[in-house]
Every structure is written in structure tokens, then in C-alpha cells.
Design a protein with these regions (language model features):
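Activation on beta-sandwich/Ig-like modules and their edge loops
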Residues: 63-79
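Secretome/extracellular-domain signature
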Residues: 77-181
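Homeobox/homeodomain signature
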Residues: 3, 39-41, 73, 79, ...
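Extracellular, modular beta-sheet/disulfide-rich ectodomains of secreted and cell-surface proteins
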Residues: 1-68, 116, 127-128, 136-142, ...
């Protein structure tokens, strides 16, 4: 995920190497020497960025990719959504950032995989600026199918050749076999 008002300042945020569901616990040296060095703290897995000056910032957010099954010919899960927007931010405003990470293999690595995490950029207590959904996990595939990628609407994709479940709607999770919404 990157934030920058052209061309003076550019901040690229990462998941800080975290693979845990709770997110990162510290910045470490991840941003040392970068434009946002010293402007970011972490609280409860959320990165808190203090805006350095008032201006228009271009924010690009990408959701985490899904994982793939052990026997999958393609070695990629569904792609996370990529969203870009311009926002007026105020000096010393706190922007809360959660960068989604890649999904994981399940306990039976041949048949289960996880979807990627969403990337969230919010101001104040929880006013969304950009939210980019993560891509779906893929069991066994021989070619890429767009139904496994994140959706840019408020309804998630069902997946490729999926009769067992459905995509989520309006922020609610999707259904699985025996647990279909509706």
C-alpha cells in the first residue's frame, strides 16, 4: 500500500512481515530511511500514521492474495483488489492502516487454502478512506479464473465452478456448503 502527494513524499506501507491474524506488533526497522520513518506506530495490530503536512495524498491499497493448493498447477491464489483514490489529509491527523497479508494453506495442504486479508485505510475512529478486499484461496487449478480474484463491488465473487458457497455481501462473509446466506 502506498501513500504520496506527487512528487515530494512517498510512503509504502507493508504488513511488517506479520503473518498472524492479529497483525504486526512493532514497526522494527521496516521503514528506516523511508519518507515515513518515525511517523508510524503500531497499536493492536493497526499501524497509526501521523500525517506530516496538509495536502492532497494519493492512496493506493491492494488486498492480500489468496493461497493455492499443493496440487494446483498455477502457483497463485486469487488476486486482491487494487484501489486508488486522492484525499485531502491534515497535518497531524492520524490515519489507521491495516495491510492484508497472503492467505495460508490449511492443515490438509492438498485440499484447503485461505483467502488473502483485506487492506484498510481509515481516518479518525473508523471513517473509511479505502478498503481493498483480499483474493480467494484456490484448491487445485490449472489456469487463472477471475472468479477467484477480489471483487470491486460490495458483493464478493462466488469463485470458479463453485456450487458449494457464495461470495459475501455488504461486509458480511460468504456462505459455504450447509451455511448458505439467504
Amino acid at each position: 500500500m502506498s501513500i504520496h502527494p506527487e512528487p515530494e513524499f512517498k510512503a509504502v506501507f507493508t504488513n511488517l512481515g506479520s503473518t498472524a491474524a492479529g497483525g504486526p506488533s512493532s514497526i522494527g526497522s521496516h521503514y528506516t530511511g523511508q519518507d515515513h520513518d518515525g511517523q508510524v506506530t503500531v497499536s493492536s495490530g493497526i499501524q497509526l500514521w501521523t500525517v506530516p503536512y496538509t495536502g492532497e495524498y494519493k492512496i493506493e491499497a491492494i488486498g492480500g492474495a489468496g493461497w493455492y493448493g499443493k496440487n494446483s498447477v498455477i502457483q497463485n491464489g486469487g488476486r486482491g483488489a487494487k484501489l486508488i483514490g486522492n484525499f485531502i489529509l491534515t497535518k497531524d491527523e492520524i490515519i489507521r492502516i491495516l495491510v492484508g497479508h497472503k492467505g495460508k494453506r490449511g492443515p490438509n495442504s492438498k485440499t484447503t487454502t485461505g483467502g488473502g486479508g483485506g487492506t484498510f485505510v481509515v481516518r479518525g475512529t473508523n471513517t473509511p478512506l479505502i478498503i481493498a478486499g483480499g483474493g480467494g484461496g484456490i484448491k487445485n487449478m490449472s489456469e487463472r479464473h477471475s472468479g477467484c480474484d477480489a471483487s470491486l463491488s460490495t458483493t464478493g465473487n462466488t469463485g470458479y465452478s463453485s456450487s458449494l458457497g457464495s461470495g459475501g455481501t455488504s461486509g458480511n462473509g460468504g456462505g459455504s456448503a450447509g451455511n448458505r446466506p439467504g
